[in-house]
Every structure is written in C-alpha cells, then in structure tokens.
Amino acid sequence: PPSYYAKLYARHNLRGGHIIKLGPGNDEAAAYALQEWPNHLHIGGGIHLDNAVSWIERGAEKVIVTSYLFPECRFSLERLLALEKRVGRDRLVVDISCRRRGSEWIVAMNRWQDLTDMRVSKGAYKRERERG
C-alpha cells in the first residue's frame, strides 16, 4: 500500500516523493500515506481548485496538477493563476509529462492519452520564465 512507501521514504529521508491517484477510490489510501510522513510528500491525480487546499491540510507538502490546467486540452493560464493564489507557488507542482508527436514534445494528460495544445521546447520554457 502507499503507506508502506511513505514510511520507507520517511525512514530514508526521501523528500518530495509522489503519491499519484490514478483512478477512483484512491483518496483514502493517499490520505493515509500522507499521514505517515506529513509535509514531505507530493500528491497528484484529480487535483483542482476546489480540493488542492484540502490535500495540503491532509499533509501534502505540494500538490501536483496537470489536467485541471487544460480544460478541453487547452492550457488555461487563468486556472494556473487561481490555483497558485489558492495554495501558493511554493506548494504547487505543474506536471508537464509529454508524449512525442513527430519531432515535437506535447504535454499529455489523462495517463498520457490526451495531447494538449502545449508544446515543450526551449523557447516555450523561456517564454514562461519571462512571464513570471
């Protein structure tokens, strides 16, 4: 169970380990794992504006988000800024897991099945850094 790994991470002082909820019925196990090493693990999977603070309160050091930021597979800066305002930049991890399409790398979500409108490149990274 996830709590086993949380205890293992705590024993070896591994900070920032990820708990990813991939499917329904994972909330209870994830919450239990967070209790095993509070404020040292990151949680992702179904994170959105209305539940992010709850996961921080349950013991997550940070929340990991992808799908919420891409309604209909299109990046929403407004959603990112709202989530950042709600939990704080230091508590937010934006997952930009990608799949290759031709010669490009595209941010993917929903278990890498859905490609978004965001391409990952040095230029895109530079633009986002300049924004803030």
Where are these regions (language model features)?
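N-terminal active-site wall of soluble small-molecule enzyme domains
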Residues: P2-H42, G46-I56
